[in-house]
Amino acid sequence: MELFQTADWKKEKHVPVIEVLRAEGGVVEVKVSVGKEIPHPNTTEHHIAWIELVFQPEGSKFPYVVGRAEFAAHGASVDGPNTSGVYTDPVAVFAFKAEKSGKLTAFSYCNIHGLWMGEATLSLE
């Protein structure tokens, strides 16, 4: 059994998608989302709980945790499941500085289907 599941994000709604929004002058902005091509359910019973982004610069032995976003609104209220009308979309933007290109890895957690992973290359100009 694999700890992290992976797949083509265009065919699987659980895979975190990494988009580099900006990578210039050492300033990096990265958007991570789940359900870009196929929307992931966001209900009290089935939702993405969090996304985490790590970065491993070229030549570095270990990756660095850039950040983590937790999603707490999944429709629950004092009136019961799926009654609040408030739902968080599993999308986060991370901003950081980097001196080298490297590998970006995002993790996401679905409360029903477990841990998922997506990867991308960060190329600095």
UniProtKB/Swiss-Prot annotation:
EC number(s) reported in the record: 1.15.1.2
UniProt-recorded Gene Ontology molecular function terms: iron ion binding; superoxide reductase activity
Matches recorded under Gene3D superfamilies: SOR catalytic domain
Name used for this protein in its record: Putative superoxide reductase
UniProt cross-references to Pfam families, sorted A to Z: Desulfoferrodox
Keyword Zinc-finger found: no
Annotated catalysed reactions: reduced [rubredoxin] + superoxide + 2 H(+) = oxidized [rubredoxin] + H2O2
NCBIfam families the UniProt entry points to: neela_ferrous
SUPFAM superfamilies hit by this protein: Superoxide reductase-like
Its job: Uses electrons from reduced NADP, by way of rubredoxin and an oxidoreductase, to catalyze the reduction of superoxide to hydrogen peroxide.
Residues reported to bind Fe cation: 12, 14, 40, 46, 110, 113
InterPro entries (alphabetical): Desulfoferrodoxin_Fe-bd_dom, Desulfoferrodoxin_Fe-bd_dom_sf, Desulfoferrodoxin_SOR
Top enzyme category: oxidoreductase
Alphabetic keyword roster: Electron transport, Iron, Metal-binding, Oxidoreductase, Transport
Native source organism of the sequence: Archaeoglobus fulgidus (strain ATCC 49558 / DSM 4304 / JCM 9628 / NBRC 100126 / VC-16)
